[in-house]
């Protein structure tokens, strides 16, 4: 039984028990489709009958309204059923949050009940020959013709290609450069299978996501009514961004269940595999590898549901959802590699799930935003957090004769604000932080003046060759550091000298 967290509601705990039982009952059937290399339509229908495709859809539209936590609970378990989990995630995320946030009431009433029932599978179509991680570089076009839109272009690496009935696509509706700079050149649409000119071009043989068709789509003068447009014209980028936190979260959650399964598999295997006259679970190396996998599973799972709780509370955890997607994918790949190592030659065969785990994890590091994109998001949004950007003040402490972190004011605070004293502030920073520049605010706070006056004086110092200024592309002063000439003018050379007590006087020069 999967461990429920203390903050789960009784309904969430009930759903967790129910879906785990469902998966256990149908696990053998999922294995059969894996070996037959067939798309598991009967299993998909069972999932639909249980209503699980409606996990994240409001009850008013026929869904279960389980929120982010409930959706992760379902994804965690269905991910154990090989291709079923990926089909569930992609179909549920094929415009769900976008429709909820941008569609008209009429559109919601038309599309959401179908999604909730699982009558139709869905796919998300962003990637193109021209657009991968650079998702804004879409070249597929949509031109207005009366009450219709005419779509031309191609999409590729579309999970669920061919088996899906509805395709949530993003197309370029403006060639204006100013629109492109403002990300106002895209519009989102729903395109149904069967539209004239809309065809499946190719299926990709991926290293993972077994039996889930992934392919190329071709649009050749495909006509759709304006009622299939989701959101305003030119707001496709905003529509795309809507619900990304939820999507990354669930895309990570679908891998959690297989991590637990591999732990069970390894305990089972190593208890029964004997080498050097003892079971292999007694070897410290194997114990360490399994301990690593257990740690990754428990840390990844708990962080996933913490992030889900944040979303259910109305927050937008951009950083945490990116972390979830990134670490779960990496954990799965690493766990697969470790499991293979523990199982030896058996781990290399398809008779055991270790090799599949490694392959699935590698795909997970690419789809739904690469690991590198997640890291970029984590860094960029973290760089905006005040808590991470509080300056660290290093002050020279005479008692210990060393720079230490301190909240006390600068020794230069209150001096007359002029070139001489400002140069001393900047030169003194060389003694404390020899490899670093100072910001305008660092200098301003140390001497006690305004930003404008600080900029004015450092410009004058620059003209005299006493400081080096690093500017932005727009020419704004960003960072300042004393030049060698500035250091000499500010203080005598002895001011900058520092030697540990053990250093011999005779060796100085």
Labelled PLM ranges:
Residues 1-81, 85, 90, 102-107, ...:
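Alpha-helical interface subdomain recognition
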Residues 403-425:
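Short alpha-helical segments that sit at the start of domains
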Residues 448-463:
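Short amphipathic alpha-helical interaction segments
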Residues 432-446:
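Short acidic, hydrophobic short linear motifs in intrinsically disordered regions
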Residues 462-472:
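A short, conserved structural fragment
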Residues 484-509:
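Short, amphipathic alpha-helical interaction segments positioned at domain boundaries
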Residues 137, 194-225:
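Flexible, small-/acidic-enriched active-site or ligand-binding loops
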Residues 152-200:
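A short core secondary-structure module
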């Amino acid at each position: 039984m999967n461990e429920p967290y203390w903050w789960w509601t009784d309904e969430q705990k009930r759903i967790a028990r129910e879906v785990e039982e469902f998966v256990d009952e149908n696990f053998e059937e999922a294995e059969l489709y894996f070996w037959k290399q067939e798309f598991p339509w009967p299993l998909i229908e069972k999932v639909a009958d249980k209503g699980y495709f409606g996990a994240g859809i409001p009850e008013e539209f026929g869904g279960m309204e389980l929120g982010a936590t409930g959706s992760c609970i379902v994804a965690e378990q269905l991910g154990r059923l090989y291709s079923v989990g990926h089909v569930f995630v992609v179909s549920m995320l094929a415009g769900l949050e976008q429709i909820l946030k941008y569609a008209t009431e009429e559109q919601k009433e038309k599309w959401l009940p179908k999604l909730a029932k699982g009558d139709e599978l869905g796919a998300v179509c962003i990637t193109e020959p021209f657009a991968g991680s650079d998702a804004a570089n879409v070249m597929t076009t949509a031109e207005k013709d009366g009450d219709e839109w005419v779509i031309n272009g191609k999409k590729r690496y579309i999970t669920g290609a061919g088996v899906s009935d509805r395709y949530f696509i993003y197309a370029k509706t403006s060639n204006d450069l100013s629109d492109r700079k403002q990300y106002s050149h895209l519009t989102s649409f729903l395109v149904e299978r069967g539209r004239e000119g809309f065809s499946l071009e190719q299926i990709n043989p991926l290293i993972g996501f077994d039996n889930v068709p992934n392919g190329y789509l071709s649009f050749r003068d495909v006509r759709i009514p304006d009622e299939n447009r989701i959101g305003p014209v030119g707001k496709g980028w905003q529509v795309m961004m809507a619900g990304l936190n939820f999507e990354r979260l669930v895309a990570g959650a679908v891998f959690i269940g297989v991590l637990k399964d591999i732990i069970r598999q390894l305990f089972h295997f190593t208890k029964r595999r004997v080498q050097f006259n003892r079971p292999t679970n007694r070897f410290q190396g194997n114990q360490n590898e399994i301990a690593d996998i257990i740690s990754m599973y428990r840390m990844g799972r708990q962080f996933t549901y913490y992030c889900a709780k944040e979303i259910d509370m109305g927050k937008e955890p951009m950083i945490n959802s990116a972390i979830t997607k990134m670490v779960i994918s990496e954990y799965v790949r690493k766990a697969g590699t470790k499991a293979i190592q523990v199982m030896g030659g058996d781990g290399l065969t398809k008779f055991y799930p270790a090799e599949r785990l490694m392959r699935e994890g590698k795909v997970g590091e690419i789809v739904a935003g690469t690991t590198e994109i997640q890291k970029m998001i984590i860094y960029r949004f973290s760089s905006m957090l005040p808590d991470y950007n509080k300056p660290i003040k290093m002050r020279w402490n005479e008692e210990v004769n060393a720079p230490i972190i301190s909240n006390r004011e600068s020794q230069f605070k209150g001096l007359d604000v002029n070139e001489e004293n400002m140069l001393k502030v900047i030169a003194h920073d060389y003694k404390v932080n020899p490899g670093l520049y100072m910001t305008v605010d660092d200098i301003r706070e140390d001497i006690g003046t305004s930003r404008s006056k600080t900029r004015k004086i450092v410009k004058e110092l620059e003209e005299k060759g006493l400081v080096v200024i690093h500017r932005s592309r727009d020419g704004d002063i960003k960072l300042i550091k004393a030049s060698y000439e500035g250091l000499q003018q500010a203080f005598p050379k002895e001011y900058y000298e520092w030697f540990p007590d053990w250093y011999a006087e005779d060796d100085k020069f």
